[in-house]
């Protein structure tokens, strides 16, 4: 089977790095694709998704601090005040590919899939689409 699955989550902070590896793996199981890749994407302009370090919790706090400091002195014209979130979303990206083999995510030993909230707290939708390999 191929297709797509969507799951939702509620972020709790303005800037938050959330490990969604388990939810993406569950989506892969629902999709029933043994080999190929998953396109993990967000229909949002103030959040991002990426693959990164999942083992050491200090990396999450380091990344959150670095993102908060990345654009503090830049003057933005957008009146809502969330232009830094839009910029960071575009810089990080709103989609990533995760290889699948034998129905399992193919990630490095320390890797995980992360949603990066940049303008929370909010409810976020994560779309997972199967891209299967032809046999």
Briefly describe each language-model feature range.
Residues 1-135:
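Active-site histidine-anchored catalytic micro-motif
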